[in-house]
């Protein structure tokens, strides 16, 4: 006969499976306990990440809109400062009406330039200053922008404020010590300003003095003729009347030739007539006798 084989009843198999399931469940619960303690922190981080992602998406959508690029009322808080009563019709600042929805609708519907003022019903436009106020402000000589105020008005020209040319002419002041030519300069200063430029181009020569009816020792006849040198270049005798000069005798500035050429008294040997050049050495070879008659 063989060995007897023991067969376990099915109830034991069922109990073993239940024990295995319970052990697995216990193991899973033990592993989840530390995760439950860290769960609030993870949840807070996840919520922050979600909020940041939604904020960036909202900002990107706002930046894409061109009509919302400027500051809004919530940022400036002007609507709270200048609110006023509801029934009042007082004008509000133009910055409060930039983002109103009716302004956008009206600006889209109306494209003509004539209807542009109607798109800003509550905006204060700058007004031009009256003529009296502008002229009163520009009356001062030390006004910085006086000409700008006059040019802005159509009826007033820039000629209303005369401009003085400070550097147009040179003004001379009289000094304490006066030279002999200063009396003549005083006469020229009396002339009008239009001839100032002409005065500087001319040379003021002093007038010749009239000593009297004395005659020149070189010209005993007093005809007013000038002797010309008889050298290589032939000059003609020119009368003084043809040169627009006074007919009176010239001032004796230089010493006579006889005094320089005859210091020892040889002038007595040379007669007053027309001696030859060899008999009168004081005259030299370059002189010729005076003509008998002058035209």
Swiss-Prot record:
Top-level taxon in the UniProt lineage: Eukaryota
Phosphoserine sites (modified residues): 256
InterPro entries linked: Lime1
Annotated segments matching region Interaction with LCK, PLCG2 and PIK3R1: 254-257
Outcome (variant: residue 145 to F): No change in binding to LCK, CSK or FYN
Protein's UniProt keywords contain Cell membrane: yes
Residues in compartment: Extracellular: 1-6
Positions with biased composition (Polar residues): 266-281
TM spans (from-to): 7-27
Lipidation (S-palmitoyl cysteine): 28, 31
Region listing for Interaction with LCK and PIK3R1, in residue ranges: 235-238
Region (Disordered), start-end ranges: 170-192, 204-223, 261-295
Residues with the Phosphotyrosine modification: 145, 167, 200, 235, 254
Residue ranges, Cytoplasmic side: 28-295
UniProt subcellular location: Cell membrane
Tissue expression per record: Expressed in peripheral blood lymphocytes, lymphoid tissues, and liver. Present in T-cells and plasma cells, and in various hematopoietic cell lines (at protein level).
Listed GO biological process terms: adaptive immune response; B cell receptor signaling pathway; regulation of canonical NF-kappaB signal transduction; regulation of non-canonical NF-kappaB signal transduction; regulation of phosphatidylinositol 3-kinase/protein kinase B signal transduction; regulation of release of sequestered calcium ion into cytosol; regulation of transcription by RNA polymerase II; T cell receptor signaling pathway
Bilayer topology term: Single-pass type III membrane protein
Region (Interaction with CSK): 167-170, 200-203
Mutation effect (residue 167 to F): Abolishes binding to CSK
Region called Interaction with GRB2, residue ranges: 145-148
MF annotations from Gene Ontology: protein kinase binding
Function: Involved in BCR (B-cell antigen receptor)-mediated signaling in B-cells and TCR (T-cell antigen receptor)-mediated T-cell signaling in T-cells. In absence of TCR signaling, may be involved in CD4-mediated inhibition of T-cell activation. Couples activation of these receptors and their associated kinases with distal intracellular events such as calcium mobilization or MAPK activation through the recruitment of PLCG2, GRB2, GRAP2, and other signaling molecules.
Subunit-structure text: When phosphorylated in response to BCR activation, interacts with LYN, PIK3R1, PLCG2, and GRB2. When phosphorylated in response to TCR stimulation and/or CD4 co-stimulation, interacts with LCK, CSK, FYN, PTPN11/SHP2, GRB2, PIK3R1 and GRAP2.
PANTHER family tied to this protein: LCK-INTERACTING TRANSMEMBRANE ADAPTER 1 (PTHR47740:SF1), LCK-INTERACTING TRANSMEMBRANE ADAPTER 1, LIME1 (PTHR47740)
Name of the protein in its database record: Lck-interacting transmembrane adapter 1
Organism of this sequence: Homo sapiens (Human)
Lineage of producing organism: Eukaryota, Metazoa, Chordata, Craniata, Vertebrata
């Amino acid at each position: 006969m063989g060995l007897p084989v023991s067969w376990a009843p099915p109830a034991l198999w069922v109990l073993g499976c239940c024990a295995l399931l319970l052990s697995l469940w216990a193991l899973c619960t033990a592993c989840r306990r530390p995760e439950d303690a860290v769960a609030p922190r993870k949840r807070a981080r996840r919520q922050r990440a979600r909020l940041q992602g939604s904020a960036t998406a909202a900002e990107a959508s706002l930046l894409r809109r061109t009509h919302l690029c400027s500051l809004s009322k919530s940022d400036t808080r002007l609507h709270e400062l200048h609110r006023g009563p509801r029934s009042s019709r007082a004008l509000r600042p133009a910055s409060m009406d930039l983002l109103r929805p009716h302004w956008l609708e009206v600006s889209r519907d109306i494209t003509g330039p004539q209807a542009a003022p109607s798109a800003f019903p509550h905006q204060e436009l700058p007004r031009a200053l009256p003529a009296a106020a502008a002229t009163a402000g520009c009356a001062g000589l030390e006004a910085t922008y006086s000409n700008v105020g006059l040019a802005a008005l159509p009826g007033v020209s820039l000629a209303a404020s005369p401009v003085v040319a400070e550097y147009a002419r040179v003004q001379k002041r009289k000094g304490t010590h006066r030279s002999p030519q200063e009396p003549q300069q005083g006469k020229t200063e009396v002339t009008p300003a239009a001839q100032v430029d002409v005065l500087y181009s001319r040379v003021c020569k002093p007038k010749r003095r009239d000593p009297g009816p004395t005659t020149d020792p070189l010209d005993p006849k007093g005809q007013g003729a000038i002797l010309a040198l008889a050298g290589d270049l032939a000059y003609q005798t020119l009368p003084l009347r043809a040169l627009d000069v006074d007919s009176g005798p010239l001032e004796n500035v230089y010493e006579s030739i006889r005094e320089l050429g005859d210091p020892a008294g040889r002038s007595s040997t040379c007669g007053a007539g027309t001696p030859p050049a060899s008999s009168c050495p004081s005259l030299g070879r370059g002189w010729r006798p005076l003509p008998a008659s002058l035209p």
